[in-house]
C-alpha cells in the first residue's frame, strides 16, 4: 500500500549568489541567483520522487522571500506552514571550486528571519497532523539558541505523535557562535531520533565516534565492512533510540574528481554500497542532502535498508552533475544508475 503521509522538513532556506564560470568573488560583475538550504533541498528531492513533502521555516514578508516560496512550490513542496516575520532572508555566497582550488562559502545570515524564530511560533501539533516523518539538521540548531529550542520543540511533538524522526548532523563550525558547542546541543536531540545521518568528520566532531574516512581512489575499489563495524556498534550504544545510522562517505581527489559511497547500520547489521566516481563534478553543494533525501524516500516507500542505501548513494552521485542546491533527478534516473547505467550516453 502506498504511503501517503507527508514528510516535514524544518530549517532555513537562503538566497545563493554564485559568480559564473568558476570566477572568484572579486572577478564577476554579475552573480547567478538560486535558492537553497539543507532541509529545503531534502524536501525538493522528496517532491521530485513523488512524495508529499512540506518545508517549514520563517521568512520575511517581502518579494525575495515570496520568490523562494514560489520556487519551492514549483518543485512540488508544500509551504502552507511557513511563518512570515522578521526583516531579511539569509544569504550565502558560493565561489565554486576548480581543480586544486577549493570552494569558498561566505554566510550572511545573522539577523535573518529564521534567526528571529522563537519557541511557540510554530504549531507543531497541527503541522504534523497528516505527517509520518520529521527531518531536521544540525544547521537549524546552530543558528541560535532559540532555533535550537524550536528544533527540540518539534522533535518532542513528533515523538509524541509517533512520527519517524531523522537528523542530519550537518556540522558547520562557523555557525556555532552563541556560547554552546555542537556536542552540547545536538547530542541530546540526536538521542531522540530514529535515523541519523552524517559524514565521518561529523560523527567524530559532534558525537565523538570515530568513523574511518573514505580512502578509495577508484570506483572499482570496494568498502570493507570491517572498517566501519566498530563505529556502527559505538553509535548503537550511544544512541539506543536510533534504529538506523547512516554514514555518508566522500573522498575529494580534487575539486573536479570525487568518489562517494556510504554505509548503513541497522539491527546489528552493517550494509555497504558501491563506490561512485564522479569526474567532472559540476556542483557539489547539496550532495549530502540528495543522499539523505534518497534514503528517506526509499524507506518511506517501503524499500529495504539495502535498497535505500543503494538509492541514496546513487542520488548523491548524480547530484554532483546538477547545478544548484536542488537534486532534480527522478526515481527512474536514480534507479537506472543503481542498475548499472552510468555511461552518460544520450537517452533516446
How does the language model describe each region?
Residues 1-24:
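Positively charged, low-complexity intrinsically disordered leader regions
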Residues 24, 41-52, 298-301:
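Alpha-helix C-terminal capping segments
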Residues 24-42:
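Short catalytic helix/loop segments, enriched in acidic residues and glycine
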Residues 52-139, 334-348:
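Conserved N-terminal subdomain of the carbohydrate kinase-like
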Residues 53, 79, 165-166, 197:
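Hydrophobic beta-strand scaffold residues
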Residues 157-164, 239-243:
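A short helix->loop->beta-strand "cap" motif at the edges of active sites that frequently abuts
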Residues 175-269:
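Conserved phosphate/ATP/ADP-binding segment of small-molecule kinases
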Residues 255, 270-341:
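Conserved post-catalytic alpha-helical subdomain immediately downstream of the catalytic base
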